[in-house]
């Protein structure tokens, strides 16, 4: 049930991949990394962009280890270790297990990978997430240019907890941060992550207790309970931005309480690593720039576009993001999102609406002009 739900969410989110990723449905392109150009180092497969692993990893000083065609793939750079298990369709980065089960229909090997002419490729979106890449496509030159993103000096440990208590099973993963930043700031952030994860488990335990009570009542009345006898929790995190002393993360809390389907609550936090302050949208924008009207129009127009293309059905008309909307930072912009049922049906999942930094560069608070400048890129 959980995997099916997450797959549905991800299918919706794939709509949001930058348009240049869908410029070609199939075909090879050149890959430029630094001063090196690799012929056919990039490839579109059914509209999804793949990058050849070896030249990208070499450019970023990662070592690629692959014993044979059917074995795990390991990417290593110092203490940074990424294990890709194509057969198991699993990726683990420094102890953090990423959910990529939804990728299997599109990949020839699984785990976001495909093999072409004895060369190993990986999905650009996944590889960017794992290694921190800035990927630009030039259709005219038939070239994909990859640069590394210079990220915050920050150690990220994954705290994992697997539970099995009565009717409840739970898998919980959340980040623990350390590094050359304010100890108080890091303590504040880590406390929030732990508290949010603990609350998810508490919610799962309550769901389990409620289900046990329902089953007991049914039995006492001489009836058998016909529903699922299981509750589950899947709590995970996704780091969206870690540059310029800013840290933006999304926490996902999936709960299944024995009904027809589960539900997911997505929570995002954006922090200033120097102070530990949680930043709101208003912190990033000039007060009198008209940003609220501009952003409301951008989101409204995108909703209309998706509805027109029959990719989305709107239950409740969207009017405004409000004064304190849910958002997170990404490498390219600010992404706004809505919870399940907030405006759209359950099947639509959590809809996300990215707005590029370029489009709001004149509205940004000068203190955060770095967001639109993209200065922190490797040569």
Predicted regions and their residues:
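Sec-dependent N-terminal signal peptides of Gram-positive bacterial secreted proteins and lipoproteins
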Residues: 2-25
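Hydrophobic alpha-helical segments and their boundary regions
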Residues: 7, 12-13, 36-37, 84, ...
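Compositionally biased intrinsically disordered regions enriched in Thr/Gly
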Residues: 24-27, 32-50, 55-72, 97-379
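Ser/Thr-rich, low-complexity intrinsically disordered terminal regions
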Residues: 72-78
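Signal peptide-directed extracytoplasmic domains
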Residues: 78-108
């Amino acid at each position: 049930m959980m995997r099916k739900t997450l797959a549905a969410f991800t299918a919706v989110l794939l709509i949001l991949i930058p348009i240049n990723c869908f410029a070609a449905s199939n075909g090879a392109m050149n890959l430029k990394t630094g001063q090196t150009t690799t012929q056919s180092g990039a490839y579109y497969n059914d509209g999804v962009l793949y990058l050849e692993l070896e030249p990208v990893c070499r450019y970023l000083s990662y070592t690629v280890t692959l014993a044979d065609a059917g074995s795990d793939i390991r990417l290593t750079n110092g203490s940074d270790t990424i294990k890709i298990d194509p057969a198991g369709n699993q990726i683990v980065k420094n102890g953090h297990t990423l959910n990529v089960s939804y990728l299997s229909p599109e990949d020839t090997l699984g785990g976001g990978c495909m093999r072409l002419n004895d060369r190993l490729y990986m999905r650009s979106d996944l590889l960017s997430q794992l290694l921190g890449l800035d990927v630009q496509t030039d259709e005219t030159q038939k070239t994909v240019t990859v640069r590394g993103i210079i990220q915050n000096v920050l150690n990220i440990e994954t705290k994992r907890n697997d539970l099995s208590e009565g009717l409840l099973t739970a898998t919980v993963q959340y980040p623990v941060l350390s590094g050359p930043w304010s100890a108080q700031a890091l303590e504040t952030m880590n406390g929030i992550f732990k508290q949010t994860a603990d609350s998810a488990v508490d919610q799962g335990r309550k769901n389990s207790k409620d289900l046990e009570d329902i089953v007991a009542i049914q039995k006492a009345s001489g009836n058998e309970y016909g529903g699922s006898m299981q509750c589950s929790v899947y709590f995970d995190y996704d780091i969206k931005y870690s540059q310029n002393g800013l840290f933006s993360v999304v926490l996902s809390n999936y709960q299944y309480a024995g009904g027809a389907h589960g539900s997911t609550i997505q929570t995002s936090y954006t922090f200033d690593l120097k102070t530990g302050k949680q930043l709101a949208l208003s912190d990033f924008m000039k007060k009198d720039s008209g940003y609220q009207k501009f952003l409301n129009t951008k989101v409204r127009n995108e909703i209309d576009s998706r509805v027109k293309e029959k990719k989305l059905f709107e239950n409740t008309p969207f009017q405004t993001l409000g004064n304190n909307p849910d958002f997170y930072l990404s490498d390219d912009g600010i992404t706004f999102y809505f919870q399940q049922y907030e405006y759209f049906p359950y099947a639509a999942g959590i809809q996300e609406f990215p707005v590029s930094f370029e489009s709001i560069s004149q509205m940004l608070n000068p203190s955060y002009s770095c967001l639109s400048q993209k200065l922190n890129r490797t040569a």
